[in-house]
């Protein structure tokens, strides 16, 4: 291994991390780095924003500029700490030996990817539905979505699970895969930190309306290209998955519905998935007891059924392999060009 170039070692570690996630998911015996990133974000949230007094709940009485600046400080600290610690781990590991470096990089790469976690959690929903337990299905889907699940019927639960797999295929699989392929664990973990900040403080609610601006906009920028690559992978791979999928319809629905979301990225993969499966996703949903109006994505060519969760997972798996193969081919091309 000592005679191998850093790029060759990176390719080996990247491949091993992908296989590890595919085989077992996140190593549960080791503390998950995303958990620690989340704790850092929560700590900085308390220190920088703190409790909002009742006399400042009125938007007109709050200092928007100051809150935005504090949010930007949080983003810079989290990114700096994440990148620095990851770089330190990689430097120390490769200093010990190439093998130690490859192992550390493979484990971190596995942590970045969520294909197995998405499949495992969404299939829990599927099994509860097949057993006729709507309450169990609601509880299972509540683990992976932010909406109120107690008001969902079986179709609503199924749609929520399919939407989650479709949307998280981008920010949970392809985006970290692309960033890890380009910049190794340092860039990959930095992306995961950005994504985690958005999921924790990137909301347009009373608390984070301005404090979360930097996190939300950075996440939009970081996911802009990966979300579109993810959608194209779903469209292309739907042609490989059998008669239950329609690539032409996936492309048509994607072109029509890809911007039917407040986020510039979220509907990219949802529209491709809806078209591939021939179902209608999105629509109004309840969050914290309030109905949020959302446009429908896709055409209702048939009723949504529990098997659509299985179909979505199959499409995600094939598309993940395709994304991985493209990354390896790109790295191989760079390696060949450097010789």
Model-found features: residue ranges?
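Hydrophobic alpha-helical transmembrane segments
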Residues: 1-190, 194, 202-339
């Amino acid at each position: 291994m000592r005679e191998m170039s850093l790029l060759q070692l990176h390719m080996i570690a990247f491949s091993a991390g992908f296989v590890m996630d595919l085989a077992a998911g996140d190593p549960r015996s080791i503390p998950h780095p995303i958990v620690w990133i989340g704790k850092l974000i929560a700590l900085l949230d308390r220190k920088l924003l703190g409790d909002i007094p009742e006399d400042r709940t009125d938007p007109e009485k709050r200092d928007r500029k100051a809150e935005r600046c504090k949010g930007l400080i949080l983003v810079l600290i989290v990114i700096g700490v994440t990148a620095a610690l990851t770089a330190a781990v990689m430097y120390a590991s490769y200093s010990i030996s190439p093998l130690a470096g490859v192992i550390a990089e493979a484990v971190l790469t596995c942590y970045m990817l969520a294909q197995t976690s998405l499949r495992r959690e969404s299939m829990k929903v599927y099994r509860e539905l097949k057993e006729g337990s709507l309450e169990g299905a609601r509880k299972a889907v509540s683990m992976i979505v932010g909406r109120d699940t107690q008001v969902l019927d079986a179709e609503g639960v199924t749609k929520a699970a399919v939407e989650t797999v479709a949307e998280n295929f981008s920010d949970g699989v392809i985006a970290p895969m692309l960033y890890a392929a380009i910049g190794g664990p340092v860039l990959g973990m930095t992306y995961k930190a950005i994504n985690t900040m958005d999921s924790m403080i990137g909301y347009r609610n009373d608390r984070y309306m301005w404090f979360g601006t930097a996190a939300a906009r950075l996440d939009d920028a970081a996911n802009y290209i990966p979300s579109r690559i993810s959608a194209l992978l779903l469209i292309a791979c739907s042609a490989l998955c059998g008669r239950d999928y329609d690539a032409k319809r996936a492309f048509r629905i994607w072109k029509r519905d890809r911007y039917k979301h407040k986020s510039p990225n979220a509907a990219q993969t949802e529209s491709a998935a809806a078209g591939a499966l021939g179902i209608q996703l999105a629509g109004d949903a309840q969050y914290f007891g309030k109905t949020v109006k959302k446009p429908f994505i896709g055409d209702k060519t048939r009723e949504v059924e529990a098997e659509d969760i299985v179909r979505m997972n199959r499409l995600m798996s094939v598309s993940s392999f395709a994304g991985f193969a493209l990354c390896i081919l790109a790295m191989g091309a760079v390696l060949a060009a450097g010789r």
